Regions:
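A short alpha-helical cap/connector motif
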Residues: 1-156, 160-239
Length: 239
């Protein structure tokens, strides 16, 4: 895998420097398949993506990275924050188009209204049978996963962006990860993270201050920060 360390951003760069999509995995060509290529053409670097009639808050680099990571993920995928189901649709479509279409996306969303809206989009796209919807607080669902030793090879975090919520997630995420898993944080590269008066955003600082040593920086793309899970750095790792 490519670590793309040259694309990392400093706190001063947040919301000022957006890196385009760069591949994490090795493959022939610029994109993994025709759907990935079409996604690249769906918006410019400054425009939010719409995918199959679903809108949201993804830049094209975010969407391309999600598709690539899900396409090559070897196990199930966890999404924390469904909203209207845009990123969920990208993840599940990538899985359907991959060589491992039996994998599942578990998506967590506290708003039942948002879950139903997302579910209707996914039914229309015929990807709903690859998605488990969890309409509960993320803390409850993650506790259940921990108790059952559920593991994921890819996690996309796009829920509560506050410092406290991100810290809480970082404290519980290692137990959910397979060795070599990737964790993608949305709104990691966002200028609102530097505004001390904006208590709704603190993703970057929370990761800088409290990410476990096992989460290694692996690049930034659009608004997203990517991290690789190195289980050798987790003294409490249980397979």
């Amino acid at each position: 895998m490519n670590n793309n360390l040259a694309s990392l951003v400093s706190r001063e760069d947040l919301g000022q420097l957006y890196h385009p999509f760069q591949p994490t995995y090795g493959y022939a060509g610029e994109y993994v398949d025709a759907t990935h290529a079409a996604l690249a053409e769906s918006a410019d670097q400054q425009t939010l993506v719409e995918f199959q009639g679903i809108d949201g808050f993804l830049r094209v680099a975010d969407a391309l990275k999600l598709y690539e990571l899900a396409f090559f993920a070897t196990g199930d995928v966890l999404e924390i924050g469904t909203h209207h189901g845009l990123s969920t649709a990208i993840l599940s479509t990538a899985i359907r188009n991959s060589q491992h279409p039996d994998r599942m996306v578990h998506t967590i969303e506290i708003s039942p209204t948002s879950v139903e809206r997302a579910r209707s989009h996914h039914k229309r796209l015929n990807v709903g049978d690859t998605i488990y919807y969890h309409a509960q607080p993320s803390t409850s669902v993650l506790s259940e996963f921990s108790a059952t030793r559920q593991k994921f090879s890819l996690v996309f975090v796009d829920h509560d962006h506050s410092y406290a919520a991100t810290i809480e997630l970082l404290d519980s995420i290692e137990v959910l990860l397979e060795p070599g898993s990737l964790v993608l944080f949305h709104d990691y590269n966002d200028s609102r993270n530097t505004n001390s008066d904006d208590l709704e955003y603190g993703v970057f600082d929370a990761i800088e201050h409290s990410a476990p040593p096992s989460l290694k920086p692996f690049g930034t793309f659009g608004c997203c920060g990517l991290f690789l899970y190195d289980s050798s750095e987790n003294k409490n790792y249980l397979s």
